[in-house]
Amino acid sequence: MKFAVIVFPGSNCDVDMFHAIKDELGEEVDYVWHDTENLDEYDAILLPGGFSYGDYLRCGAISRFANAMKAVQKAAEQGKPILGVCNGFQILVESGLLPGALMRNENLKFMCRTVQLRVENNETMFTSQYEKDEVINIPIAHGEGNYYCDEETLKKLEENNQIAFRYVENPNGSVSDIAGIVNEKGNVLGMMPHPERAVDELLGGAEGLKVFQSILKQWRETYVVNA
């Protein structure tokens, strides 16, 4: 399986994402600059955290216009797994690939610590290796991670089982404690916590690795078993 880590000016979690795939998952991965127009050779696309374009205007508001995002849109339409973490989640929302918005944290402060998440849906291509309602420890590092959507959108997310993760103790004011959501098709996940920072027991825990293992399992079942 071959992954692409999209690198925008200001990305700073791309190395962590690359390490998670190459060294922990053991799969092929490339850094792909934001001006690329073709992602056809990749089986999964990863949008890392950071401060793309300095977070000017709004987080992710400029990155949505990058050439690579047109290719990401195409990959999403093809059903390829797309994972956006932190700033990557913000970019997915700004691009219209996921509903809602990310606002300033309720306390107006940047937050950097490990939090507990509850797995709300383990039937997605990103969460199949977790148990339903499993509580996992994953780091957060954001100033604008307060997820917001209107009541109609929230109702739709809940009815369609699109809420992948919730905070056990809400750190930022996100509506309904939401930490991560998938699109209706189930192949695009956006989450504020950083699973790529929780892939090595030596560095404090590996409870985020199952996100990437789930992607790999889905790909193998779809393309290797049926080959």
From Swiss-Prot:
Active site (catalytic residues): C86, H194, E196
Q: From the Swiss-Prot or TrEMBL record, state where the protein is found.
A: Cytoplasm
Q: Which GO terms describe its biological process?
A: 'de novo' IMP biosynthetic process
Q: What is its main location?
A: cytoplasm
Q: Which CDD domains does the annotation name?
A: GATase1_FGAR_AT
User: Which Pfam family, giving just one, matches this sequence?
Assistant: GATase_5
Q: Which Enzyme Commission number(s) are listed?
A: 6.3.5.3, 3.5.1.2
Function, in words: Part of the phosphoribosylformylglycinamidine synthase complex involved in the purines biosynthetic pathway. Catalyzes the ATP-dependent conversion of formylglycinamide ribonucleotide (FGAR) and glutamine to yield formylglycinamidine ribonucleotide (FGAM) and glutamate. The FGAM synthase complex is composed of three subunits. PurQ produces an ammonia molecule by converting glutamine to glutamate. PurL transfers the ammonia molecule to FGAR to form FGAM in an ATP-dependent manner.
Against NCBIfam families, the record matches this protein to: FGAM_synth_I, PRK03619.1
Q: How does it assemble?
A: Part of the FGAM synthase complex composed of 1 PurL, 1 PurQ and 2 PurS subunits.
Name recorded for this polypeptide: Phosphoribosylformylglycinamidine synthase subunit PurQ
State the gene name recorded for this protein. purQ
